[in-house]
């Protein structure tokens, strides 16, 4: 008998739920992150914030900016900077594709979540995104409210 492996849920360290409201999400990418030991330990506590973080190309490499990973309490003087730029590990073609979309099409590379994969490595889910206007946000909010009201009406009648 062969045993089936059940896929373990990914341990999400940080989630950018606001990005799906503020941006129209396009293609997504998975990237590795270069972290120090205290950053990894701090990420495992689940207190990181990526609400305002974005990725940008610099000298042919992708960097993650403005991601907040709090100091690890047990590290005392060997701690890391909380908002330092972190290098992202992507293939050259992916970096070129992201750079082209940012320069030519006016898109932004947004971090959607940071998680640990099956091997315990920290990964960032990036997305090519285009900013929404205020009226688009209001329209999305109205649609969401209507869907909720419709579900409530169907539940009460049925």
Swiss-Prot record:
One of its GO terms (cellular component) is cytosol. Keywords: Cytoplasm, RNA-binding. Residues 131-158 are annotated as: Disordered. Its main location: cytoplasm. It is found in: Cytoplasm. GO terms for molecular function: RNA binding. Residues 136-158 have a biased composition (Basic and acidic residues). One of its GO terms (biological process) is trans-translation. Transmembrane segments: none annotated. InterPro entries: SmpB (IPR023620), SsrA-bd_prot (IPR000037), SsrA-bd_prot_CS (IPR020081). CDD domains: SmpB (cd09294). The keyword DNA-binding does not apply. PROSITE patterns: SSRP (PS01317). Required for rescue of stalled ribosomes mediated by trans-translation. Binds to transfer-messenger RNA (tmRNA), required for stable association of tmRNA with ribosomes. tmRNA and SmpB together mimic tRNA shape, replacing the anticodon stem-loop with SmpB. tmRNA is encoded by the ssrA gene; the 2 termini fold to resemble tRNA(Ala) and it encodes a 'tag peptide', a short internal open reading frame. During trans-translation Ala-aminoacylated tmRNA acts like a tRNA, entering the A-site of stalled ribosomes, displacing the stalled mRNA. Belongs to the SmpB family. This is SsrA-binding protein.
